[in-house]
């Protein structure tokens, strides 16, 4: 008598499950991503589609620098002056931590000026930090042929407010404190100025530089009004 094999429905279900699992594993193997080793032939340099010229989108010219700022390496022959050094303290759980704060202004007397603030436990280190910060914060200031301003300006920063006026030849720099330091290092020779705000040295320096940057030459006024220089002077 031949043996007759009988299969129950439970055995059939188990066989179907095992076959489905095997098929699923096979599909997973086929669907796995294939990684290609990087070679010099198949690697391409990264390119931005939105910016094909690789220009930084921080300024109009694409240089990445803020307007009226100068690259550190392009300025030579800088003069340095320390506006002031004061003692500051910070209260913590362990007590008061005493430090020194130094404010420095640098310029080449050709329309380039910068300022910086440095803090440290020692005065020489604070001055060194202030000078380094000033070299990284250089600004371009406009000046006419007579080494004075094109027109009157008022610079504001915080509680600081500074009035600066052009003066006739031979007048000199009529100013005091940090304002005079900034004007002299910029290269101005005949200027009137007056402090209309608080006497904080840092705010006075910032207000002076902001006021000087507000100047506009006659050519700029002519282009803004769509006129020639003759029409403006008439």
From Swiss-Prot:
InterPro entries: Ribosomal_Su5_D2-typ_SF (IPR020568), Ribosomal_uS5 (IPR000851), Ribosomal_uS5_bac-type (IPR005712), Ribosomal_uS5_C (IPR005324), Ribosomal_uS5_N (IPR013810), Ribosomal_uS5_N_CS (IPR018192), Ribsml_uS5_D2-typ_fold_subgr (IPR014721). One of its GO terms (cellular component) is small ribosomal subunit. The keyword Ribonucleoprotein applies. Residues 1-10 have a biased composition (Polar residues). The keyword Ribosomal protein applies. Residues 78-141 form the S5 DRBM domain. Residues 1-69 are annotated as: Disordered. GO terms for molecular function: rRNA binding; structural constituent of ribosome. The N-terminal domain interacts with the head of the 30S subunit; the C-terminal domain interacts with the body and contacts protein S4. The interaction surface between S4 and S5 is involved in control of translational fidelity. Belongs to the universal ribosomal protein uS5 family. PANTHER family: MITOCHONDRIAL RIBOSOMAL PROTEIN S5. This is Small ribosomal subunit protein uS5. It comes from Malacoplasma penetrans (strain HF-2) (Mycoplasma penetrans). The lineage of its organism: Bacteria, Bacillati, Mycoplasmatota, Mycoplasmoidales, Mycoplasmoidaceae.
């Amino acid at each position: 008598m031949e043996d007759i094999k009988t299969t129950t429905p439970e055995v059939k279900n188990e066989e179907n499950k095992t076959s489905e699992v095997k098929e699923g594993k096979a599909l997973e193997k086929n669907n796995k991503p294939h990684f290609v080793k990087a070679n010099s032939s198949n690697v391409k340099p990264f390119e931005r589609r939105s910016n094909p010229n690789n220009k930084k989108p921080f300024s109009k010219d694409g240089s990445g620098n803020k307007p009226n700022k100068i690259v550190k390496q392009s300025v030579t022959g800088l003069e340095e002056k320390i506006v002031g050094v004061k003692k500051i303290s910070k209260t913590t759980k362990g007590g008061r931590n005493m430090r020194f704060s130094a404010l420095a202004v640098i310029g080449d007397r050709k329309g380039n000026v910068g300022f910086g603030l440095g803090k440290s436990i020692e005065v020489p280190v604070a001055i060194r930090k202030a000078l380094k910060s000033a070299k990284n914060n250089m600004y371009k200031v406009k000046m006419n042929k007579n080494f004075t301003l094109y027109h009157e300006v008022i610079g504001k920063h915080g509680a600081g407010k500074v009035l600066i006026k052009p003066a006739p030849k031979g007048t000199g720099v009529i100013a005091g404190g940090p304002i005079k330091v900034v004007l002299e290092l910029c290269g101005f020779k005949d200027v009137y100025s007056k402090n209309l705000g608080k006497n904080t040295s840092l705010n006075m320096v910032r207000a002076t530089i902001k006021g000087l940057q507000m100047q506009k030459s006659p050519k700029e006024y002519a282009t803004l009004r769509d006129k020639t220089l003759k029409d403006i002077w008439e």
